[in-house]
């Protein structure tokens, strides 16, 4: 461990080590300026273009120059068009963000009132929860389940005659249908 609170001014004087378990090594030592600067080089060599030209005269093969091919989509386009495109992209991005927020609010932030349970993103009464759990998740099977449930309910209820249609008129209609079937046969 290092004992804090050493005086850096007393660098030259050595203190005897104390027997308390701490070293008296200073945490920071001053830097010498000579360590930071490198001596300047004796000779500086600067290569110029004239030094490379003799290589061409000697017949050495140089790689062929390849023409640069750059395509700029903004060349010849006005600043007004660039700003318009930037604004359109910003509006498209903001529209996507708004739709995402609306979707999340619609899809996940559903709270049902008392006495209702959230089942398949719909609030249903607690009494009908067992009916909805019997249904399968596919839409076609849900459709057939509802139809079968309607047929069972229709059979359990006694057939009632509408007040505007009497039993006699039903019998007349059935007789007319049978006569029409006999004539066509």
Swiss-Prot record:
InterPro entries reported in the protein's UniProt record: NSG
Subcellular location: Membrane; Golgi apparatus, trans-Golgi network membrane; Endosome membrane; Cell projection, Dendrite
A molecular function GO annotation: ionotropic glutamate receptor binding
Region feature (Required for GRIP1 interaction): 129-164
Tree of life domain: Eukaryota
Entry-linked Pfam families: Calcyon
TM region positions: 83-103
Tissue distribution of the protein: Pituitary and less in adrenal gland and testis. Expressed in the hippocampus throughout development. At P0, highly and broadly expressed throughout the cortical plate, but is down-regulated overall at P8 and P14, but remains relatively enriched in layer V. At P0 is expressed ubiquitously in the developing cerebellum namely Purkinje neurons as well as granule neurons. However, it becomes restricted to Purkinje cells by P8. This exclusive expression in Purkinje cells is maintained throughout adulthood.
Family: Belongs to the NSG family.
PANTHER family: NEURONAL VESICLE TRAFFICKING-ASSOCIATED PROTEIN 1, NEURONAL VESICLE TRAFFICKING-ASSOCIATED PROTEIN 2-RELATED
Record's protein name: Neuronal vesicle trafficking-associated protein 1
Organism: Mus musculus (Mouse)
Name of the gene this protein is made from: Nsg1
